[in-house]
């Protein structure tokens, strides 16, 4: 009877003492902090991955240029690139037609009204025609839509044209300031200024958008030239209206011409400094031409 009692004592005492630790062991071992620790570890990893991706993307774009390709070759699918190339051609043709008509009108205003800004705008309009023609050459070859070498050659030509046109604009504006030529206002001048300002501004926006998608410095430069044309168109109207109300501010027209000429000159120099070395780097990668 005593062993049985001992067994009963052990059996009665056994369930009371050991099971509680066993029953509480799973909650104690439950991975409560684990889900909290995983989000804490992920942000540093994600941040490191982002930094690595940013550095790799910069190195990758440099590698693309070294191989004669633009960054658009990795962003756009072939049919998308061709679609944007056709849009760039259409915008360039439209720009040539519009700016050529505005150039003729602006030259007429410059001769009839002795306007330095009108002469500067006419020169800039011709520059816009030439730059749009260069963009046409740039995208005339469907296989060269991502060609970095072709892109940089177009930019170098644009830089040279910018320098030559800026010199002509500044010389003409300084001559008008030295001879104290006074601008005149009429309906024809008003119409040319409004049309040139609006149309060139619209063309500039379109070229900037296409240049960003195609990663084309030539298109962006062409857009900058159109933007300058829009500013010059409005400046003709501004200087004429100011002179109409205050004849003492006769120098505003020539001063704007000098400022715009210097701006174009600075942009042309910057373009040549950036693009001439790249033409040399990519001269061996004309695979798409």
UniProtKB/Swiss-Prot annotation:
Determine the domain of life of the protein's source.
Answer: Eukaryota
Query: Can the keyword Cell membrane be found in this entry's annotation?
Result: yes
What ranges does the Extracellular topological domain annotation cover? 110-116, 172-187, 239-255
What results from changing residue 76 to R? In HLD25; severely decreased function in zinc transport; does not rescue developmental defects and myelin deficit in zebrafish morphants but results in a more severe phenotype
Q: In which tissues is it expressed?
A: Widely expressed. High expression is detected in brain, lung and testis.
* Effect upon mutating residue 61 to R: Results in decreased zinc efflux
One of its GO biological process terms is: zinc ion import into synaptic vesicle
Q: Where are the transmembrane segments?
A: 89-109, 117-137, 151-171, 188-208, 218-238, 256-276
List the membrane topology term(s): Multi-pass membrane protein
Q: Which residues carry this modification: Phosphoserine?
A: 11, 55, 57, 61
Q: Which residues lie on this side of the membrane: Cytoplasmic?
A: 1-88, 138-150, 209-217, 277-289
Q: What do the Gene Ontology cellular component annotations say?
A: early endosome membrane; late endosome membrane; lysosomal membrane; plasma membrane; synaptic vesicle membrane
Q: Which GO terms describe its molecular function?
A: zinc ion binding
Q: Which PANTHER family match?
A: TRANSMEMBRANE PROTEIN 163
This one is known as Transmembrane protein 163
